[in-house]
């Protein structure tokens, strides 16, 4: 996200949550909202991976997110599903996040002829640079799938990316 923001001249700041659980992401967003209250126009996006979170608990957190005025960006089972869409259109059901990550790892390594582990790919800070040439494909792949929030897989990451792409660089 930050790579795209930099390319478009938008200040995107990814903040660490107290953990990756949906509850912790929401709690962190509420605290950041207080910090940015008097800083002008700030839109807070909460990026959620469903991972192993209970369905009802996950739905409740998403409702609270919307009620607080945050934009929710959801990936089921995980963020790596969005990354996978840069390589292929798939609505293959995944048993869990690990299977999705391994599928992304395989596609990434095949494309770039590398031998990254899942852990190394998750830590990669310049992944936008690697995938930016496939961004339009990822958006088209996500748009073409029958994606519903309670499906696995699901992502609405392309909606935030589409908004960012509409911004013009301001001088």
What are these regions (language model features)?
Residues 2-16, 23, 30-45, 50-171:
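C-terminal accessory helical subdomains adjacent to catalytic cores in phosphodiester-
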